[in-house]
Amino acid sequence: MIEAENLSKHYGPKVAVDGISFRVEPGTVTGFLGPNGAGKSTTMRMIMGLDAPTSGRVTVNGKPYAKHAAPLHEVGALLEAKAVHTGRSARNHLRALAATHGMPSKRVDEVIEMTGLSAVANKRVGGFSLGMGQRLGIAAAMLGDPRTLILDEPVNGLDPEGVKWVRTLGRYLAAEGRTVFLSSHLMSEMAITADQLIVIGRGKIITSGPVQSVIDATAGTSVTVRTPRASELAELLVSDGVSISASEPGLLAVRGVESSVIGETAARHGIALHELIPVRASLEEAYMTLTAGEVEYTSTASGATTQDGPLA
């Protein structure tokens, strides 16, 4: 379990993390989402004791990371895949980590096989591709068979097979009762991997909760209706909490009304429906809505802009 209470981090006048509180429960995969610069990596570094909080506290399995006698058995983390000695082989890198906790070479061999690095285990890390570097970082995180796993952008650089492998691994570890906390910019992948979400922007938590609850509360669902009597049907459906838009003649997007109600209303008034399709919003749509005002850099059709104006 990971617990943060009023956690803040300031770098001079810049507030990177601003008084956030959250809990990451065992037995779940919790996704940590937010734009670049939102405070995700800083938060993960504070969890791992690499950055000291300006105020507040964070514990892993009941203690600050530094207080654990054998931290690799409690927490495994991938924060920066390139944080390795490039002249060492993958096997020797893992052996060096294992030696700090008295772990046998057998465990090194196990995580090498688990992460698909057997063919390159004796090659220097400096020659690894980005994807192989990510796999090595995950191998290091799994080395101590930890109760909690923290992964910052674990699928970065992985091919589709590797992305699927990370998803399967995360789900498997959570099913074993472990705590899995991961960040990613791949919304489609997060939607099918995570149970819970924490969304952060400009150092503050924007929202949190089960994946589908976050989507429904933010973007919800709509119903696509195609009918030759669109204007008439729209007038019949108008009420408080209902929004109706028309992207083209005869086509309506309706929010706030179930498809069954639309169908029954049309039937009562003899209105023919050519399409009646419930459309569930995606996590990407919900995320873009939630973070629309939280990004440091945005782009427009006419050119790139920042908070201070157009880029030269």
Locate each region found by the language model.
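ABC transporter nucleotide-binding domains
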Residues: 2-4, 9-201, 207
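Residues at or immediately flanking beta-strands
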Residues: 57, 222, 272-275
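Residues that scaffold the ATP/ADP-binding catalytic core of kinase and kinase-like folds
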Residues: 68, 214, 286, 290
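ABC transporter nucleotide-binding domain
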Residues: 166-257
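C-terminal coupling/interaction segments
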Residues: 255-312
